[in-house]
């Protein structure tokens, strides 16, 4: 928007020419403003959003409103106060007075002296009555009273719409009194929310039907219903009394009804809520991808800055830098490197795409979401009705700013990005629970002693498939389903609110997926902790038994089998613990088979000495296995008990990682724990706790704490 120190005759900050008929701003097309709004990192922008969201007051002046401020007013009820900028009063009054003066002079203006839409050929001099009729015929929504289905727009979306509509009207181009905006602000500040229908708008000419119910409350229509701060149902009179509006119902002046309903505020308000959450969830998905790499023993080189610098896309570069920061210095990354060094053939040279290309996958989604955010922020600071009152040129401009195409397009794009994030999350989850891919974690992430009675996250994986399928369906565009409406006057329309509603649904599903994935990642972290403790005790026990049984012969002499210990320990080091630990000494499991294999190989190399019982390695095998069967199960059980009692010999290494704040939040603040078949608690109960935290914002601080040390740049290329 072009801003000049001296406003035009409307009293607003917008001007078109400098007095000589020349454009007064070299960014007259606003591309520079749009580009400037994208400066800095996405994470910094999210941090600013969170900071704004937590402020106690949202000042409204017709410009500078952000999606985070909309979300704050919409979701925090009386926790955030709305204040109208007094300096906007003059411009608002000027346009309102112009409408009245214009009608008194007999000027013919759409919606003031004419009918509406395709019937605008009709004429009347009863300006106030015309506005009342506008509200009456637009009250065409269905609420489903007496049925199980709810057809009412959510409370938060309605509050968002009210806030956005005030902001656009304050710019002084709509021909409406300042007192009406003050009344709407009082309803917001007293947490009184009119009931708006969920459906019935095509967001061109604006969100006519739902906004007519806000207008219906203001004029005291008998069918007007509101929800009070305690959930009580209020009629219009009760709502006015509770809000402290002493002037009584408004008698609409010419154009005021049209000014209230002919805007995109419902679609853009709900879009603001969806985007506020989406911006947070995409940062969460970056961190979850990094944690996924940690627990999967991934190779961190996929985040190397040179790779992403050569691709040039800023979203990808930032996603990689964030993951690189999480993985830098991670204990799991260091441990994985040791695994790769010991046996480079134990896993593929390259990690699978869901891990290795996660920055390339998430980067474009970040860019789409950022662009949609800026588009919606421009929309909620726009004048969206028709006609527009240009006091400075003494004319009413008949145009089409009510066309909510920026909402429909940005929401379609956002929904596609959300679906892509969910698809990546599902692919990562599927690898995590599959013991063929997860580098030693148990199948289904089972945590019990007996895997035959523990199927872990099998149900959660099925649920994730369901979530992902629905999310992919929702990714289909809304805006290509336009129907010609209102006697073919509204022959193209944006479907902005419908697209916003579908995007809000997609956000909910992504939260379901994110909460399930986060619980699974915490389970994997705990299983890595158990794995490390179990491997340690198995190595110690094998070492002790080897020293006791294999070092000396029957007469106390040094025995050739003493050289087997190193190779025996290498077997333990390389073998996945959860492949045998439920019955560590079973002859059908790989541990005992490979330990025996080592001893047999050494016996074959022992040559002629195998014929002598005092030097035969082969004859030691039975004693070694018997001793191991006596000791190892007891030691394994002892370690399990110690871990369960919070006294592990090896601490949980997540404490040493930058991802720890999120793990700590899930485990300590939300009270979740390792899921096993031996416990009563189900996966869904734990996922519900995390989902609630994603919905109410409690996850934000621990999420950002994971990145508090990041300086906003990738590690240098050395």
Swiss-Prot record:
Main location: cytoplasm
Catalysed reaction, written as an equation: L-phenylalanine = (E)-cinnamate + NH4(+)
Single GO MF annotation: phenylalanine ammonia-lyase activity
Cellular component terms (Gene Ontology): cytoplasm
GO process terms (BP): cinnamic acid biosynthetic process; L-phenylalanine catabolic process
Cross-link (5-imidazolinone (Ala-Gly)): 204-206
Protein name per Swiss-Prot or TrEMBL: Phenylalanine ammonia-lyase 2
Species the sequence originates in: Cicer arietinum
Gene (UniProt): PAL2
């Amino acid at each position: 928007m072009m801003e000049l120190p001296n406003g035009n005759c409307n009293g607003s900050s917008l001007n078109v020419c400098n007095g000589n008929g020349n454009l007064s701003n070299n960014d007259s097309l606003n591309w520079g403003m749009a580009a400037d709004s994208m400066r800095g990192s996405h994470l910094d922008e999210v941090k600013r959003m969170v900071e704004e969201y937590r402020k106690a007051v949202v000042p409204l002046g017709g410009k500078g409103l952000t999606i985070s401020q909309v979300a704050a007013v919409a979701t925090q009820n009386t926790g955030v106060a709305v204040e109208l900028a007094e300096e906007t009063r003059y411009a608002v009054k000027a346009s309102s007075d112009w409408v009245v003066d214009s009608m008194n002079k007999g000027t013919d203006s759409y919606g003031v002296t004419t009918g509406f839409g395709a019937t605008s050929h009709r004429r009347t001099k009863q300006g106030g009555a015309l506005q009342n009729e506008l509200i009456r015929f637009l009250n065409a929504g269905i609420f489903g009273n007496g049925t199980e289905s709810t057809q009412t727009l959510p409370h938060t979306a309605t509050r968002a719409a009210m806030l956005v509509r005030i902001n656009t009207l304050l710019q002084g181009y709509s021909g409406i009194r300042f007192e009406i905006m003050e009344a709407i602000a009082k309803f917001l500040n007293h947490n009184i929310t009119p009931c708006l229908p969920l459906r019935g708008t095509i967001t061109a000419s604006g969100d006519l039907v739902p906004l007519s119910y806000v207008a219906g409350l203001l004029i005291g229509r008998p069918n007007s219903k509101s929800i009070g701060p305690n959930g009580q149902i209020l009629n219009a009179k009760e709502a006015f009394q509770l809000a402290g509006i002493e002037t009584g119902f408004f008698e609409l002046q010419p154009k005021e009804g049209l000014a209230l309903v002919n805007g995109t505020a419902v679609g853009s308000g709900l879009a603001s809520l969806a985007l506020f959450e989406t911006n947070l969830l995409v940062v969460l998905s970056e961190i979850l991808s990094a944690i996924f790499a940690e627990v999967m023993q991934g190779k961190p080189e996929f985040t190397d800055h040179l790779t992403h610098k050569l691709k040039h896309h800023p979203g990808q570069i930032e996603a990689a830098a964030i993951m690189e920061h999480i993985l830098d210095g991670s204990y799991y990354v260091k441990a994985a490197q040791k695994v790769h060094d010991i046996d480079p053939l134990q896993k593929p040279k390259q990690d699978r795409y869901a891990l290795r290309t996660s920055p390339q996958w998430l980067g474009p989604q970040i860019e789409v979401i950022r662009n949609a955010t800026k588009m919606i922020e421009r929309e909620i600071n726009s004048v969206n009705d028709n006609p527009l009152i240009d006091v400075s040129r003494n004319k009413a401009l008949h145009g089409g700013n009510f066309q909510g195409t920026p909402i429909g397009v940005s929401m379609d794009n956002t929904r596609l990005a959300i679906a892509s994030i969910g698809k990546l999350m599902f692919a990562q989850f599927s690898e995590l629970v599959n013991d063929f891919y997860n580098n030693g974690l148990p199948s289904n992430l089972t945590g019990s002693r007996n895997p035959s009675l523990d199927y872990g996250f099998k149900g959660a994986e099925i649920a994730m498939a369901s979530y992902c399928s629905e999310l992919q369906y929702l990714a289909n565009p809304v805006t290509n389903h336009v129907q010609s409406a209102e006697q073919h006057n509204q022959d193209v329309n944006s479907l902005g609110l419908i697209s916003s509603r579908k995007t809000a649904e997609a956000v909910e599903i992504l939260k379901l997926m994110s909460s399930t994935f986060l619980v699974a990642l915490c389970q994997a972290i705990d299983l890595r902790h158990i794995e490390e403790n179990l491997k340690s005790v198995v190595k110690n026990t094998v070492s002790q038994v080897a020293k006791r049984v294999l070092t000396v012969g029957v007469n106390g002499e040094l025995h050739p089998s003493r050289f087997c210990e190193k190779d025996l320990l290498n077997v333990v080091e390389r073998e996945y613990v959860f492949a045998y630990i439920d019955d560590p000494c079973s002859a059908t499991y790989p541990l005992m088979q490979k330990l025996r294999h080592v001893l047999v190989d050494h016996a074959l190399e022992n040559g002629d000495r195998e014929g002598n019982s005092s030097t035969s390695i082969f004859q030691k095998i039975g004693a070694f296995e018997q001793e191991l069967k006596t000791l190892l199960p007891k030691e394994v059980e002892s370690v399990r008990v110690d871990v369960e009692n919070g006294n592990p010999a090896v601490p949980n290494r997540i404490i040493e990682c930058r991802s720890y704040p999120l793990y700590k939040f899930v485990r300590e603040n939300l009270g979740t724990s390792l899921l096993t078949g031996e416990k009563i608690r189900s996966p869904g109960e734990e996922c519900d706790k995390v989902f609630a935290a994603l919905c109410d914002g409690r996850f934000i601080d621990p999420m950002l704490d994971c990145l508090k040390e990041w300086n906003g740049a990738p590690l240098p290329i050395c």
